[in-house]
Amino acid sequence: MAEFEYPQGFELIAGVDEVGRGPLVGAVVTAAVILDPNNPIDGLTDSKKLSEKKREKLAEEIKQKALAWALGRAEPEEIDALNILQATMLAMQRAIKNLKIQPHFVLIDGNRIPQLAIPAQAVVKGDSLVAEISAASIIAKVSRDHEMEVLDKQYPQYEFAKHKGYPTKVHLAKLAEFGVLPQHRRSFSPVRKLLENE
């Protein structure tokens, strides 16, 4: 992992990341993780760079070894009511609030920080630079992928397990063929256009 200079003077530092800003379906899922410096985890990196099998294995290890971890989410209705950016910020606030130990400082992937009562810093490419953010990205990704597998069993014709709700050619074709589900984000352009043309 490239060198990242941690903020000085803070004992408990949480990393926060989100997954699922781009999909047309389901919640945006965020995670917050406080790692244990005495219980290191090998192989932490951006969840997108890991195989599904490796992500699953690491997610279990993170949950066992971390001092604290939590998920936060914003549902499709909230995404539609707020917009995806604001809904992501809300989900991040929820993940931090759900931690059983409150951190002294929060490092957040990307370039925006939600409103928090704790000092925080945004880190561009944080999921590759900061172990805590990598851990959060892995837990969030595994959690959301599992949700898509559940949705896939409910609606097999949409093939959610394959595309995870992202606007792939397959998903757009299935959407046009079978229509909009309650779990679809109505404010997202392909879904909105379909609803307008009904």
Swiss-Prot record:
Residues 11-198 form the RNase H type-2 domain. A divalent metal cation binds at residues 17-18, 109. One of its GO terms (cellular component) is ribonuclease H2 complex. CDD domains: RNase_HII_bacteria_HII_like. It catalyses: Endonucleolytic cleavage to 5'-phosphomonoester. It comes from the Bacteria. Signal peptide: none annotated. It is an enzyme of class 3 (hydrolase). Keywords: Cytoplasm, Endonuclease, Hydrolase, Manganese, Metal-binding, Nuclease. One of its GO terms (molecular function) is RNA binding. The keyword Kinase does not apply. GO terms for biological process: DNA replication, removal of RNA primer; mismatch repair. The keyword S-adenosyl-L-methionine does not apply. Its cofactor is Mn(2+); Mg(2+). Its EC number is 3.1.26.4. It is found in: Cytoplasm. Belongs to the RNase HII family. Endonuclease that specifically degrades the RNA of RNA-DNA hybrids. This is Ribonuclease HII.
